[in-house]
């Protein structure tokens, strides 16, 4: 499959199942903690500066944003989890919305689960990974912000993340930086394998 990343539009921001796009294009969901670099990851893969809005304010994405890529594929930006300044009720609402999408959407081919390479995975990161494994949803685990860690320490950080998450070696693990595009090719290769 050849994808022209210049042909991009936002299809819809959906709050529930009835708003999901009705076509049968494959979908790749992107999930991670607030401020893990999800928007930067999307923008880097699509060679755009501000297609997915980056924000210094965590918790900005509150709906499922469906990005149409070349009329062939949707990236689905999932609300960032683990953000404290959102009410418990709001977090529960997001949780239900995310769970409904991940467990019922037939178009979903894989989830890019993003973690920050600098830190041990959070409780939320572990829960998301376990959830995806439980439902047999293919996972591409992406460790972001690699430019913030000396290259010589990448292996150590990778080991810490994999151990904490009880990483399944059949999943992809990609070290990524939106600053210098480390992992750009590997990320696209992993995504295209699921389409």
UniProtKB/Swiss-Prot annotation:
* Source organism, top-level taxon: Bacteria
Determine if Magnesium is one of this entry's keywords.
yes
Kindly list the cysteine pairs connected by disulfide bridges: none
Q: What keywords appear on the UniProt entry?
A: Cell cycle, Cell division, GTP-binding, Magnesium, Metal-binding, Nucleotide-binding, Septation
Residue ranges of every copy of the EngB-type G domain listed in the record: 24-195
Q: Which GO terms describe its cellular component?
A: cytosol
Q: Pfam families in the record, alphabetically?
A: MMR_HSR1
- SUPFAM superfamilies associated with the record: P-loop containing nucleoside triphosphate hydrolases (SSF52540)
Q: What GO MF annotations does this protein's record show? A: GTP binding; metal ion binding
Enumerate the cofactors the protein uses.
Answer: Mg(2+)
Give me the residues that bind GTP, please.
Answer: 32-39, 59-63, 77-80, 144-147, 176-178
Report any one BP term from Gene Ontology. Answer: division septum assembly
- UniProt binding sites for Mg(2+): 39, 61
The UniProt family comment states: Belongs to the TRAFAC class TrmE-Era-EngA-EngB-Septin-like GTPase superfamily. EngB GTPase family.
HAMAP family under this entry?
GTPase_EngB
Describe the task this protein carries out.
Necessary for normal cell division and for the maintenance of normal septation.
Q: What is this protein called?
A: Probable GTP-binding protein EngB
User: What species is this protein from?
Assistant: Lactococcus lactis subsp. lactis (strain IL1403)
